[in-house]
């Protein structure tokens, strides 16, 4: 009987039901299929990368712009996760992506975003990854970013801070950014956040 069960037994039962539910959703080959929800930075960074590479696709730009606009909150910001607080870096990237999508800076939703960005420290207060996107877009100086020497990959596994002690996602990110940062490329996008 449930009313006679101890808290530990109730927790154990809940855990087993959750496990069984997940195993029931697993495909025979061992994988799960489901929706992956993310924030607007993936779409914003995709548009920034496409602009950097010169890969203009009006349909993709329009779709990304619609998605980013649909996730903007009433105060002009975007969050990092559903229901989360406003995030400065996410808002800066979304704003720039919408400018690339053709949104005018004096449009009410853009003015709200820009004013919020300014009130919360501006681009100077964004995370390093956002400032790297800004540098690639000619909106931030590479001189004002941390330097990660690509030679870092040569450090042996026994050395402190060697890349083999990092998670695979961190290793891929840091090595790629170290290489890009050593070249310091910039392709001005002809817009600003001001």
Which residues make up each language-model segment?
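Preference for long, amphipathic alpha-helical scaffolds in soluble/luminal domains
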Residues: 1-194
